């Protein structure tokens, strides 16, 4: 019961922080927006794969609420939040993260997220994710390929991610 209560509290806090955020005066509101990253999650522990499935479904919804000004070399970063789902069979977890995304240039970026993970069985724990990405479309709906590693502090739901990210 406490597990679901914490999920609702974390979700309410996340949504409340989004409602209260205002863009910095230097940032362009066109640079803000949502991202959806859908793909696969491959648990790193064999025991987890044997208890559920080898490959899990993975999806994240992110929102960037602040974008920095680019440096002379073109580097800039976003601050944001994300909520996701990773699961297959009877196993799953929901990560709720604050995110930092650094853009090295027009194509390459990296992302680090930290927050709370809510596994289907067990108590909530510290959750994290790191990703590398490559933008291969810069049109009206940018598309990127991402690879990374995500998990929770308990270590039973950690693994590799591969996904396609859409920005709108």
Feature locations, PLM:
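Cleavable N-terminal export/targeting peptides
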Residues: 1-31
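Short glycine/proline- and aromatic-enriched beta-strand/turn motifs that initiate or cap beta-hairpins
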Residues: 22-84, 159-167
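Ser/Thr- (and often Asn-) enriched beta-sheet segments in non-cytosolic proteins
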Residues: 35-37, 144, 151
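Generic secondary-structure microfeatures
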Residues: 40, 83-87, 102-104, 108, ...
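Solvent-exposed loop/turn segments connecting transmembrane beta-strands
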Residues: 46-55, 85-94, 116-127, 150-161
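Feature captures outer-membrane beta-barrel proteins of Gram-negative bacteria and organelles
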Residues: 56-70, 94-106, 124-138, 158-168
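Repeated loop/turn-to-beta-strand initiation elements of outer-membrane beta-barrel proteins
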Residues: 68-79, 107-110, 136-145
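Outer-envelope exported proteins of Gram-negative bacteria
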Residues: 80, 97, 111-113
